[in-house]
Amino acid sequence: MKINDLKPTIVWKFFHQVTQVPRPSKKEGKMIEFLESFAKEYKIAIKKDQAGNLLMSKPATPGMEDRPVVVLQSHMDMVCEKNNGTKHDFDNDPIETIVD
C-alpha cells in the first residue's frame, strides 16, 4: 500500500505533495514557492510578510458561513536528522514515506 491509497484520499494526496518538497530549517524557500503555487491553483487568498510567513484564507463553503471558523497553524520547515551512513540529501531529496 502507498500513501496515496490511504483514506481520505484528498488529505493524503496533499500530504504526499508536501513530502516531495525539500524544506530543511532556514531553507524554506521551496516550501514557500510550493504553498504560493498551491494557493494560486486552488484560488486561496495568500499574504506573505517580510519574514516569509504565509497567511492563507479561504471563505466558507456557501451555506456554511454561520459555522465556527477553523484555524490551522504549521511550520514550513523540517528539522533534519538521519542515521550515520545514509545518503539522503535534505536540501534536494524528497521524503520517502512508508505505510506500515
Outline where the language-model segments fall.
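Residue-identity detector for glutamine
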Residues: Q17-Q20, Q50, Q73
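Bulky hydrophobic/aromatic packing residues
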Residues: W12-F15, M31, Q73
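N-terminal hydrophobic or amphipathic helices/low-complexity stretches enriched
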Residues: M1-V21
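Phenylalanine-focused residue identity feature
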Residues: F14-F15, F34, F38, F90
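A non-catalytic alpha/beta surface segment that caps or lines the substrate-entry region
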Residues: P24-V70
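Active-site metal-coordination/substrate-binding segment of hydrolases
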Residues: E65-D100
